[in-house]
Amino acid sequence: MEMIKFGQDDIENAMADMGDAQIDDLAFGAIQLDETGTILAYNAAEGELTGRSPQDVIGKNFFKDIAPCTDTEEFGGRFREGVANGDLNAMFEYVFDYQMQPTKVKVHMKRAITGDSYWIFVKRV
């Protein structure tokens, strides 16, 4: 399997060829959302970071139900703007603190190469 690096320019290309088990094996969190923020996929690394089971979060809204601390202009605003413009590609640092110990992370948002979905990649800093 090809090594996927957090923040790599073509990460959306690599993700398109990966199955669920390979996505779970990533060394960083990977959350796939639809345009409204509904969670389509949530890998094991993200579950370990947040203490949430992937099975419990799929189908819920990321910004409203799972991580309301991200429903800010800095995070959710970037997501909505990128979706509206069709060119989501942002990388920034953030602190997750909803129902967990405050944790500084690096976030990389990218539009998926196929379909109408979007990836949020998360790595502890």
Curated annotation (Swiss-Prot):
Keywords: Chromophore, Photoreceptor protein, Receptor, Sensory transduction. Transmembrane segments: none annotated. It holds the Pfam family PAS. The keyword Lipid metabolism does not apply. Residues 23-86 form the PAS domain. InterPro entries: PAS, PAS-like_dom_sf, PAS_fold, PYP. This photoactive protein is a photoreceptor with kinetics similar to that of rhodopsin. Belongs to the photoactive yellow protein family. This is Photoactive yellow protein. It comes from Rhodothalassium salexigens. The lineage of its organism: Bacteria, Pseudomonadati, Pseudomonadota, Alphaproteobacteria, Rhodothalassiales. The gene is pyp.
